[in-house]
From Swiss-Prot:
The gene is END3. It comes from Coccidioides immitis (strain RS). It is found in: Cell membrane; Endosome membrane; Cytoplasm, Cytoskeleton, Actin patch. GO terms for molecular function: actin binding; calcium ion binding. Its main location: membrane. This is Actin cytoskeleton-regulatory complex protein END3. Component of the PAN1 actin cytoskeleton-regulatory complex required for the internalization of endosomes during actin-coupled endocytosis. The complex links the site of endocytosis to the cell membrane-associated actin cytoskeleton. Mediates uptake of external molecules and vacuolar degradation of plasma membrane proteins. Plays a role in the proper organization of the cell membrane-associated actin cytoskeleton and promotes its destabilization. GO terms for cellular component: actin cortical patch; endosome membrane; plasma membrane. Belongs to the END3 family. Component of the PAN1 actin cytoskeleton-regulatory complex.
Amino acid sequence: MSEKRIEQWEVERYWEIFSSLSNGQPRLNNAQAATVLRNSRLRDEQLEKVWDLADVDGDGELDFEEFCVAMRLIFDLVNGELSEVPPSLPDWLVPESKAHLVQATQALSGREPQFERVEEDDDTPGLKDGFDWYMSPSDKGKYEEIYSANKNHRGELAFSSLQDLYESLSVPDTDIRSAWNLVNPSASSTINKDAALAFLHILNNRHEGYRIPRTIPASLRSSFESNKIDYQLDNVRTAKRWGVDNDTDTSTGRKAKFGDAYLSRLGIGGRTSYKPQGTDFSNTIQDEEWEKVRLRRELAELEKKLAAANTAAEDRKNGRTVAGGPNWALIKKEALQMLEYKERELRELREGTGRVKEGENLERLREDVNTVGEQIEGLRVHLAKRNEVLAVLRRQIEEEKRNR
């Protein structure tokens, strides 16, 4: 079982890069990610393959989980951990929230991994007949402990997620795979809860010296094949606690009770978040984090605009010019002076007096006067709009303060 994973410090570093590029949005497009990807100096065809692998949902953009996948692939290529871009994502690098998409893609492309069907050896010495499908409450509680510790976010169990358990059992690898094939008739990469409990029950009995059955009761098989997914994870019953009684010795008196050492090593006293396969981002960047980023950015912008508006209003009140902006009072004054001057020239032209030069075009002066009048009207409209914007900003800030 691979021990590779994306470490927490890597996730935090990737988050800093991602948030600086995304402008508060939950996804990066190709243009936004191009700069940081090309800084790796990998060949364009390599970057294209990395993008295609990381874009698990195929929407042409990278969310944060997919961005982490892309960055880790790039770093492994740059550091020599990988000589070329792999044809598919390794299991440890697949985000758990998108594992079902990868499995569906593999199934459609015919690459779904399947175990070779292993014929049972009826002549295995020392094994007993009489396998019983009945699960005692204590055994079932223990199975649910193990299932809860290793299920993914969709309530399903992968074969490789129980590798540590397999190593703690006195069960050959061929028998473990035979039991998996028995409860997984569709050869899927994961099984549902009913199949998982049956799988653990088979392993328990094999650990106690019973032969693995050849068939499964029809009622159980139908529940395995339907493979209905319960997305309401809160509906999954809490695993029952179990203890070790004085009569918990195995039939041999020497073996450890099924799963005891494994559960003790996990430190399970009930439901746990232990997930040994894949990359789980559930405890890193949540949707609430995105909302916080957006709200902080919006609040900072609103506060900045309010401060600027208050400063401008105070400057206008005191007759000062707003730094970095036009002095509308001065512009208005100059425009009125220009209008007065043009009106005076027009009046002198009509009366034939004053300094009006011979041959000046009366129509030209009229156009100038009209232009100045339009400019003044435009300034008035603009001032009214800016006052409306200021009022809207103040209302938004008051709403933000009330919502805090």
